[in-house]
């Protein structure tokens, strides 16, 4: 009986995961650009973006955490990358409380507490390919 309940619970989580990821991408990219201004002290995105205190974020959606060439990630972020991909749901969780999700992350920012702000900034970041160009252009 326990295994059946566990299997049912796991199945429900797996079915909900794409929906969670989609919800995180329903944000407003224009509003996300404004939210991202508070991230710009450490991060850059767009054409010509370069690493700063934190890594540049072009093409972050779909990237394995801790793998951007040219940036020195914490051992904790590199370990987190084993088995994770930056998708909307993972970014949403991380941006809410970075140090709770990746204990030992170099990111000092405490997190974006508001769901809508996280959805907006994720929608904004999702617009950029690896070269900082708007996707689809």
Task: Give the location of each predicted region.
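Bacterial N-terminal signal peptides
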Residues: 7-17
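Electrostatic cytochrome c docking/interface patches
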Residues: 19-36, 47-48, 136
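The canonical Cys-X-X-Cys-His
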Residues: 32, 36-45, 121, 125
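Positively charged n-region of N-terminal signal peptides that target proteins for export
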Residues: 1-6
